[in-house]
């Protein structure tokens, strides 16, 4: 058995609202994922796949609430942590998330390099802009994106380029665990295959260069 990178034990989360009955969105989920391995979660629309993805990051905001269970990333328990602590210490470098409809996750009025700076500065506020640019340039090129993309706005990019840009930003700190919520759902079949292959190649590169 290889090193366990993500372990979840009897995780329970639920949606709590004033006007509706509480709903357990994740009810007793347990799983283990070893280093270098992947796990797919399948189910019909509305069954809770996206909620599970959000829950696994240990990052909760109303109406979604953590109830009980353990989430352990590379031996570090993150369940029950305060949202600010998760954002500063966990998201990005320990565990990263590529959202569903990722193409809509980019503010159209902001340059791409600013998104990269925000992610990195959350963990290393003193990193010089030149170092951030060099790191971003290398990561973007791995995903087939020219360095010029960093100076563009989201509205200037095609759908496929936006998707790859979100992947590049999400993985800029080489996270130990990557959670992808249907990252290729808005793309055509050819682009879907390309994005999935790039994600796999990216994670394999990070594993070989820890």
Q: What would you call each of these model-derived segments?
A:
Residues 2-5, 14-28, 59-65, 82-86, ...:
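A short, flexible loop at the N-terminus of ABC-type nucleotide-binding domains that lies
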Residues 66-77:
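Conserved ABC transporter NBD signature motif
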Residues 130-148, 200:
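Conserved ABC ATPase "signature" region
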Residues 153-157, 161:
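Conserved ABC ATPase signature
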Residues 172-176:
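A short, proline-enriched helix->beta-strand linker immediately N-terminal to the Walker B motif
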Residues 178-181:
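Catalytic Walker B motif of ABC-type/P-loop ATPase nucleotide-binding domains
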């Amino acid at each position: 058995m290889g090193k366990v990178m993500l372990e979840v034990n009897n995780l329970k989360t639920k949606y709590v609202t004033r006007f509706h009955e509480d709903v357990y969105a994740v009810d007793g989920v347990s799983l283990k994922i070893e280093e270098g391995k992947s796990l797919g979660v399948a189910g019909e629309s509305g069954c809770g796949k996206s909620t599970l993805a959000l829950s696994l990051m240990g990052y909760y905001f109303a109406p979604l609430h953590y109830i009980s269970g353990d989430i352990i990333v590379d031996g570090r328990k993150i369940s029950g942590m305060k949202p600010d602590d998760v954002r500063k210490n966990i998201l990005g470098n320990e565990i990263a998330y590529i959202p569903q409809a990722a193409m809509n996750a980019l503010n159209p009025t902001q340059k791409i390099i600013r998104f990269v700076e925000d992610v990195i500065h959350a963990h290393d506020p003193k990193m010089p802009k030149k170092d951030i640019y060099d790191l971003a340039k290398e990561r973007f090129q791995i995903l087939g994106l020219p360095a010029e993309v960093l100076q563009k706005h989201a509205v200037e990019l095609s759908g496929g380029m936006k998707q790859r840009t979100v992947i590049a930003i999400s993985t800029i700190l080489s996270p130990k665990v990557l959670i992808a919520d249907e990252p290729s759902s808005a793309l055509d079949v050819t682009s879907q295959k390309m994005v999935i292959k790039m994600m796999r190649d990216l994670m394999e590169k990070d594993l070989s260069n820890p």
